[in-house]
Regions:
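Bacterial N-terminal signal peptides
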Residues: 1-8
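Intrinsically disordered and other compositionally biased segments
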Residues: 10-12, 91
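Short glycine/proline- and aromatic-enriched beta-strand/turn motifs that initiate or cap beta-hairpins
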Residues: 12-58, 152, 158-162
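Solvent-exposed loop/turn segments connecting transmembrane beta-strands
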Residues: 23-36, 76-78, 105-117, 141-150
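Gram-negative (and chloroplast) outer-membrane scaffold detector with strong preference
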Residues: 40-133, 159-162
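Internal, hydrophobic beta-strand segments that form the core of beta-sheet-rich folds
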Residues: 135-137
Length: 162
């Protein structure tokens, strides 16, 4: 009986204060691609703090050929940012949970400083070994950017840090 109690207590504690590195890639409206690399610190009840670096590319059709060519894809509009997000858990189930994502960032495009406010929903599915798969619906408000609003879907993976 005592062994079962100790095993249960250590299992519960293992989910608290866990850390993960995550990589997510997504498509944003209109003609945008997004990549985020982050460090996530999970606190009690699947609430979490996320420290992230984000890159964004917006492509356009080439003026000379009317198609998307390498120059119109890679050199049209690019931005990056570094930020923090708080993610309170709003739904829990067996091997999955959902979090709101509320954050802020600062960064740059090729010309000016950008500020951002980030809002969204993230749903996580827990796999063996502490790995997680997630999808995220994100809405970003970018201050002084080419796009004022960015919205889209991101898919990613989270790897445990021991």
């Amino acid at each position: 009986m005592a062994v079962a109690l100790i095993a249960t207590a250590s299992t519960i504690k293992a989910q608290t204060n866990s850390n993960r590195i995550s990589v997510g890639v997504g498509a944003l409206y209109e003609r945008g691609l997004d990549m985020t690399i982050s460090y996530e610190h999970e606190t009690k009840y699947h609430n979490a703090w996320e420290y992230f670096a984000n890159g964004y590319i917006k492509w356009d059709e080439c003026q000379s050929c009317g198609h998307i060519c390498p120059d119109s894809f890679w050199r049209n509009y690019r931005s990056y940012g570094f930020g923090i997000a708080y993610k309170p858990c709003v739904t829990r189930g067996r091997n999955h949970h959902g979090n709101l994502r509320i954050g802020a960032s600062g960064g740059s495009d090729t010309k000016d400083f950008l500020g951002g406010a980030h809002f969204g929903y993230e749903h996580n599915y827990t796999l063996r070994g502490g790995w997680k798969l997630y999808w995220q619906v994100k809405s970003d408000i970018m201050i002084k950017g080419e796009d004022l609003f960015r919205t889209g879907i991101v898919l990613g993976v989270k790897l445990p840090v021991k």
